[in-house]
């Protein structure tokens, strides 16, 4: 190689293999450079296309186009609060909206919450006891569902009231977050952990079942407390009877001493004046002593009662004054507790004197005299209503000359308590009767079962389609099935034959029988579950779950009567007030919405506490979320939900600005902005604390002198506290604003609330075709 380099001959240059290598290297280098040039050209082209696309996007979707959407939202914003979707929680939001508008549910939850708040205070006092630690944790976990429901109800009512008073504060949407209730459900049932889609009927049964268990737990504790109270009352009565017996003995002793004095002064014997049967004071001589003794015996037998009445005027005040001087505190505590005595027991001397009205008590204001009274009244105050305590006539310390009233022990009024404890039983729970009739001996056997919902089919079974006999269905076969047909399938007469024969106790062998299902007790609200999901015959289900959707339409009436399937004749009729719709293909996918009819607004009673934003309630007040909690919550969303990260380090892009976030679609067409922005607006006390009517503001400013100082003083007074007239004006304004929606149907799609016409609602309820959105749960209330 060193000899080849300096050579300049043409032959060597032509036959040199190194020259070919150089050419080959140059060839590869040209290819690489060409690729590099092509790559740079493509980058330039991409930059040009990106610039072009960016300009095209800016022209097609300008930032100014989002403002009409906001204006349209502001005009169409309704005074009804929606619920934010927290990650596939449409099944929970639809059920909560129905329960919120269910008649009697909110008042029952509030009553239970008041009982639980008192129980929590009692449990805090017993926190140091180790034996009852597990019971406390279980009870507090079951109590938390009621507290979460009450917290959600308060937040919804407060948000609704603040919107009606200041609608300009809410421009985007009116919704709150059921996060506390969702966390409580996850603690009670781990099935709801995560962000999977669940069945709306299952979550309804879970909520009602836990409420029922809580009511039973409270009822057991109430019965136990009443038993403890009755034992205390019995102990007090025993002590009182023993004290009364001691008082009787003292009275006997004092009367004997007095009789001895009289007998000594008159020269009579002690036996002549026993047990109060004393004779008149007459002067007798020693000569007629024997004849007078016989007269005294006959007269004492005839005038025993009369002499007692005459001498009682002289003896009783002396004994009472002596008793007051010797034992004042003991006597006063006995008199105060006399209203607990039973009149069926043997009356004592003190009760006789009280019944005659001869005793006038002198009740002082000493504190140590009332210790027993206060202890008993505190125990009774926990379990009695105010009406029961008012009936008992206890004397005030200031009355010195009032007679003592001895009353019987009155039973504790537990009517309101029982209604609160039977919230689920009264509203949602009915009773079915399963009758089985033997076809040989015609004997009947009945079995009763409780129900909270009725599961009815939406189409005929395949076996019934094959068989042409339609003995089960009372109606002829039609293409469009009705709800009455579905209920008749539920309450149909079933004939037990073949291998499934019935063992009759009278016949002592297996016989053919007929079995029917009838309604014996009907609740206030009937929940009808339409069996829209069936096991799919496909071996592989791409959607998962294994339950496919049946989109067969079912004619659903607005009014319903179950007299045909009842055990006894009844005139009760039910009206449809809520429907939970499901749109989708399988049970593990799709979206739930709720349609509710707004009724009974004339009898609407709003809580005045919801108009006071600066509340100090710790248990029932909804807890606002700070920025850190919102970060953790939003980041935990699954892939199906749109996650929005709020952080100071990560700057948001120009394309995803605040206005475009509002148009991001969530589950089921939900168009909701970020939860943290909405909650900061809803939970801002400064904006809501200054809520007042425009008319009230004008009237208040007209009464002032027109100075800025008076205006500032009035604004500060409005923020610190509002007078009673302001409360009444606000409540009347809110009620009048809500009355506009009387009888209208509202569609709750998570955070969105819309008004639907009755015609459109009926078309969606009973469609002519087979749509993907069908009714799933029907709620009828008693008219």
Swiss-Prot record:
> For this protein, what reaction is catalysed?
Thiol-dependent hydrolysis of ester, thioester, amide, peptide and isopeptide bonds formed by the C-terminal Gly of ubiquitin (a 76-residue protein attached to proteins as an intracellular targeting signal)
One MF term in GO for this entry? cysteine-type deubiquitinase activity
Enzyme Commission designation = 3.4.19.12
Query: PTM comment for this protein?
Result: Autocatalytic cleavage of USP1 following UV irradiation inactivates it, leading to an increase in ubiquitinated PCNA, recruitment of POLH and translesion synthesis.
- Which region ranges are annotated with the description Disordered? 1-22, 34-55, 234-311, 685-722
Q: Where is the USP domain?
A: 81-783
Residue stretches of biased makeup (Polar residues): 7-16
Point out residues bearing the modification Phosphoserine: 16, 42, 67, 473, 766
Location(s) in or outside the cell: Nucleus
* Family in the record: Belongs to the peptidase C19 family.
Biological function: Negative regulator of DNA damage repair which specifically deubiquitinates monoubiquitinated FANCD2. Also involved in PCNA-mediated translesion synthesis (TLS) by deubiquitinating monoubiquitinated PCNA. Has almost no deubiquitinating activity by itself and requires the interaction with WDR48 to have a high activity.
The molecule here is called Ubiquitin carboxyl-terminal hydrolase 1
User: Which organism does this record belong to?
Assistant: Bos taurus
């Amino acid at each position: 190689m060193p000899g080849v380099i300096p050579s300049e001959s043409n032959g060597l240059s032509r036959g040199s293999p190194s020259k070919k290598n150089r050419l080959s290297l140059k060839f590869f280098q040209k290819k690489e450079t060409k690729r590099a040039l092509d790559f740079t050209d493509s980058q330039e082209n991409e930059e040009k296309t990106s610039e072009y696309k960016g300009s095209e996007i800016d022209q097609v979707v300008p930032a100014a186009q989002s403002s009409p959407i906001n204006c349209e939202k502001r005009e169409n914003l309704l005074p009804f609060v929606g619920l934010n979707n927290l990650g596939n929680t449409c099944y929970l939001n639809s059920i909560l909206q129905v329960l919120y508008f269910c008649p009697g549910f909110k008042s029952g939850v509030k009553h239970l919450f008041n009982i639980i708040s008192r129980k929590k205070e009692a449990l805090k006092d017993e926190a140091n006891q180790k034996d009852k630690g597990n019971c406390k944790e279980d009870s507090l976990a079951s109590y938390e569902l009621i507290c979460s429901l009450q917290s959600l109800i308060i937040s919804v009512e407060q948000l609704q009231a603040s919107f009606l008073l200041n609608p300009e504060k809410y421009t985007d949407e009116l919704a709150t977050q059921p996060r506390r209730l969702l966390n409580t459900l996850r603690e009670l049932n781990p099935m709801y952990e995560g962000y999977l889609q669940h069945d709306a009927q299952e979550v309804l049964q879970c909520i009602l079942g836990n409420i029922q268990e809580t009511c039973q737990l409270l009822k057991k504790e109430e019965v136990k407390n009443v038993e403890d109270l009755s034992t205390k009352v019995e102990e007090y009565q025993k002590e009182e009877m023993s004290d009364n017996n001691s008082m009787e003995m003292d009275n006997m002793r004092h009367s004997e001493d007095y009789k001895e004095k009289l007998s000594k002064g008159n020269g009579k014997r002690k036996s002549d004046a026993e047990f109060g049967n004393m004779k008149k004071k007459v002067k007798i001589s020693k000569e007629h002593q024997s004849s007078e003794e016989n007269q005294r015996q006959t007269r004492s037998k005839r005038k025993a009662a009369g002499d007692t009445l005459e001498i009682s005027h002289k003896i009783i005040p002396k004994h009472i004054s002596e008793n007051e001087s010797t034992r004042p505190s003991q006597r006063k505590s006995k008199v105060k507790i006399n209203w607990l005595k039973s009149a069926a027991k043997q009356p004592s001397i003190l009760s006789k004197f009280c019944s005659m009205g001869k005793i006038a008590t002198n009740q002082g204001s000493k504190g140590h005299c009332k210790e027993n009274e206060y202890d008993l009244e505190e125990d009774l105050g926990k379990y009695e209503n105010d009406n029961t305590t008012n009936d008992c006539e206890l004397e005030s310390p200031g009355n010195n000359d009032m007679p003592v009233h001895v009353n019987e022990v009155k039973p504790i009024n537990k009517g309101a308590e029982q209604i609160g404890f039977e919230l689920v039983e009264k509203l949602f729970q009915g009773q079915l009767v399963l009758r089985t009739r033997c076809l040989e001996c015609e004997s009947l056997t009945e079995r009763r079962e409780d129900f909270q919902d009725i599961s009815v089919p939406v189409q005929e079974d395949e076996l019934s389609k094959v068989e042409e006999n339609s003995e089960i269905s009372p109606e002829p076969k039609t293409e469009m099935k009705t709800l009455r047909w579905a209920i008749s399938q539920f309450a149909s007469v079933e004939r037990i034959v073949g291998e499934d024969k019935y063992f009759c106790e009278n016949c002592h062998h297996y016989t053919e029988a007929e079995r029917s299902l009838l309604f014996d007790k009907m609740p206030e609200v009937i929940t009808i579950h339409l069996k829209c999901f069936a096991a799919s015959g496909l071996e592989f289900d791409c959607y998962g779950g294994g339950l496919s959707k049946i989109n067969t339409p079912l004619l659903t009436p607005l009014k319903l009567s179950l007299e045909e399937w009842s055990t006894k004749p009844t005139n009760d009729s039910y009206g449809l007030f809520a429907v939970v719709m499901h749109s989708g293909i399988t049970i593990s996918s799709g979206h739930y919405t709720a349609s509710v009819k707004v009724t009974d607004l004339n009898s609407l009673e709003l809580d005045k506490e919801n108009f006071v934003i600066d509340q100090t309630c710790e248990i029932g007040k909804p807890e606002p979320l700070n920025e850190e909690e919102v970060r953790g919550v939003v980041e935990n969303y699954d892939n199906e939900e749109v996650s929005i990260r709020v952080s100071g380090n990560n700057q948001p892009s120009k394309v995803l600005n605040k206005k475009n976030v509002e148009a991001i679609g969530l589950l089921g067409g939900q168009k909701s902005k970020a939860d943290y922005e909405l909650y900061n607006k809803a939970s801002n006390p400064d904006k809501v604390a200054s809520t007042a009517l425009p008319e009230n503001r004008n009237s208040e400013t007209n009464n002032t002198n027109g100075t800025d100082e008076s205006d500032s003083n009035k604004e500060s007074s409005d923020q610190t506290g509002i007078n009673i007239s302001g409360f009444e004006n606000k409540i009347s304004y809110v009620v009048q604003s809500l009355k506009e929606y009387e009888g209208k149907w509202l569609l709750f799609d998570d955070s969105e609330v819309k008004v639907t016409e009755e015609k459109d609602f009926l078309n969606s309820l009973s469609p002519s075709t087979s749509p993907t959105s069908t009714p799933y749960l029907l709620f009828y209330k008693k008219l």
